[in-house]
Design a protein with these regions (language model features):
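Non-catalytic signal-transmission and effector/linker regions of two-component phosphorelay proteins
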Residues: 1-14, 20-21, 27, 114-130
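Receiver (REC) domain active-site loop signature in two-component systems and cognate sites
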Residues: 64
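Hydrophobic/aromatic residues positioned on beta-strands within the core alpha/beta folds
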Residues: 88-89
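Active-site T/S-Asp motif of two-component receiver
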Residues: 60-61
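Alpha4 helix (beta4-alpha4-beta5 surface) of REC/receiver domains from two-component response regulators
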Residues: 71, 92-108, 116, 120
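Acidic, metal-coordinating helix/loop segments flanking the phosphotransfer/catalytic sites
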Residues: 39-57
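Conserved phosphotransfer cores of two-component systems
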Residues: 50-53, 75-82, 103
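Acidic catalytic/metal-coordinating carboxylates
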Residues: 41-42, 68-71
Length: 130
């Protein structure tokens, strides 16, 4: 195992999306890059899991029923959690710029997102965490 692969294996990425197929595709991509993943079907599911301290990067849809990705990020910040976050959205015209709402917002990518852009954004997010 290379040092980079070992570092990735010790890193957990949370994926929050209400669309099963998107969540599954993102999980496959992130795992194929050597990261551990945890998936959630809603912002409320993620917040209720109480594993926020174990998450190194958060990938979240913006538009979800119950609570949006933006509302989830605001709640994380309000409760003292600072997880580098990447938003993905089917509505790029309404996407917030990096740093909006919180310096933890690293990127906002359009769906379907380019694999290389997402993986690059994860690397930026992980560097921000350290």
């Amino acid at each position: 195992m290379t040092q980079n692969t070992q570092m990735h294996a010790a890193t957990t990425i949370a994926i929050v999306d209400d669309d099963d197929s998107v969540r599954s595709a993102l999980e496959g991509l992130v795992r194929s890059s050597g990261y551990k993943t945890r998936t959630y079907c809603s912002a409320l599911d993620f917040l209720g899991a109480n594993l926020k301290n174990e998450i190194h990067c958060l990938i979240s849809d913006i538009q979800m029923p119950g609570m949006s990705g933006v509302e989830m990020l605001k709640q994380l910040v309000a409760t003292g959690y600072h997880i580098p976050t990447i938003f993905i959205t089917a509505y790029p015209a309404a996407a917030p710029p990096p740093g909006a709402y919180s310096p933890d917002l690293v990127a906002c990518l359009s769906k379907p997102c380019d694999a290389d852009k997402l993986l690059d954004s994860i690397e930026v997010a992980l560097q921000q965490r350290h």
